[in-house]
Amino acid sequence: MKQAISRIFNKDIKQIEELKKLDIHVNFNEDDILKANAVIIGPDDTLYEGSILYFKIVFPNNYPFHPPSITYLPNNKIRIHPNIYVNGRVCLSLLGTWSGPKWTSIMDISSILISIKSLLNNKNRKLINIK
């Protein structure tokens, strides 16, 4: 099973490399390919500019037919976004934790991470607890 998943990830490597241009970085666990960590740098000209957000990614055995789980790893106990909780929950339709378009097997981890980064483009300071 892990060999099949490894082949799928190999197809995604180019896209994962492209994420670096968007200040999104993914690092797979050397001992378990089903686990990874991601870092998203806050977008320029937003409240999150220069912020570093850490995420834990766990891929199911039936990936890509089901989405990975994504957990936010906060630096403190302050909620930074209406869709990103201090307890680690990320509300995103692709993850099945929010309304909207659902995950499909043609999607990959890039789809999720780009969607999370796009959440950070919201410039409405009233929605978040950062000054």
Q: Which ranges hold each PLM region?
A:
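UBC/E2-like fold recognition across ubiquitin and ubiquitin-like conjugation systems
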Residues: 1-52, 58-131
